[in-house]
Amino acid sequence: FLKKPIDTFYQRRLQVRFEAVEEDDTDNENFDLNGLDRWRLDNELIQEGVVKAASEEELHERLEATLDRMARRGDLGMGVTEHRLRTELAGRLPDLFQRYRGALTEWPEAVAEPLPFECRYSDSTGAVEVVDLIDNLRCNPSGQLCRLVIANAGLLTGSGYSKKVRYANLLRDWLIHLAGQLSGQPFETVILGKEEGRKFHFPVMAPEQAQKHFEAILGRWMEATTRTLPIHCEAGFAWITSFYGGKKFIGDHERAISEAEQAYSTALDRDTGYLLGAFESPEALMASGEFEALLHQLYVPLWEAEQGKSAAEQIGSME
């Protein structure tokens, strides 16, 4: 829902699913990985190598064995292509392995059992009960808890100094983090990015603050099954990072709107039908005036946790 709020109404209420149509390229038979294949192989290498290896030597042995298995399955193509993909897939894993081992040193003891979570919420739209188990928990010698995970997807986009955080790929772990603060055993969250040297951290929160954010998400999720909410993830974070984190453009409302509209226009270009069916233009998305209220409810708390700062204080510091 948080990643694709507009899709929720179509899929849950109308039972409509638009599928992306891929055209066969009959003139070009060069082997390469699509995004989903690369994600699958990436995570197989991480689970079989980074997570299970106890030393650098064992890491390289495990990576080679896993890559050989992928090659036998035909996942890596042949010849020069296979060599290139082996290098691309395994190249950044030694850095990730070192960071993972460092985190294990800080949080040495794995929690044997997952942490149960249960939450009931109701409003004028209806009622919902959320029940789940939270895993990947570890503790330090002081008994403090941490959920330590390696990111499933890339957490940065762009290159060089223009790199930006892909907040959409932090949403799942953020939601689990909020839930954990309500479990009676609050924990911090550490997410190791696949990108070199990158780590994201969510600190322990006051239960009442986490409950406010969690219930706001549940309430909007239920509402999203009754109508298309005028909010879009990438557009929302484009507004937030411009208005609250735009350095020399901080507090510039017109620029924030422009950044959000540009992000939504980009999303429309690759839309399979959901966005065009609901809000066919950036102007249509903004027309009701709800966009900014929704992004403050659904997305600003994540930005604040990742940045370690208050959005309101960012604006207050200018006064």
Where are these regions (language model features)?
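Structural signature of nuclease core domains in nucleic-acid processing machines
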Residues: 1-319
